[in-house]
Amino acid sequence: MYTSAEVWVREFVFEVFQRPFGGEVRWCASWQDHPEAVLRLEAMWRAWEVLHQDDGLGLSRWLLSHFDPSFTVLTGRTGPFARCTVERHVA
């Protein structure tokens, strides 16, 4: 459905999961420069591509087992974006 994790983040994640970034929830506009973020988002995208096709519990399984825990780590106070802001990348 999506050709890459980068396209999936831009066209799906940001459209569906709109979070107010700042404070406890962190994001980096240069997420591609954070190896952990790339790995986690790639894993979430690959799981999405398989599980969203499951008419049964696929979406629930994806949310609970893949998206929720990984996105919480990514955007948390001690995650890969801990020193970044939406406007400022810190390697």
Predicted segments with their positions:
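Amphipathic alpha-helical interaction modules
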Residues: F17-L51
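Alpha-helix boundary/N-cap detector
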Residues: S4, W8, Q32-E42, D54, ...
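Amphipathic alpha-helical binding modules
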Residues: G56-A91
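Alpha-helical repeat scaffolds in large eukaryotic proteins
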Residues: R10-F17, E42-H52, D68-T75, G79
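Short terminal alpha-helical segments
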Residues: M1-W27
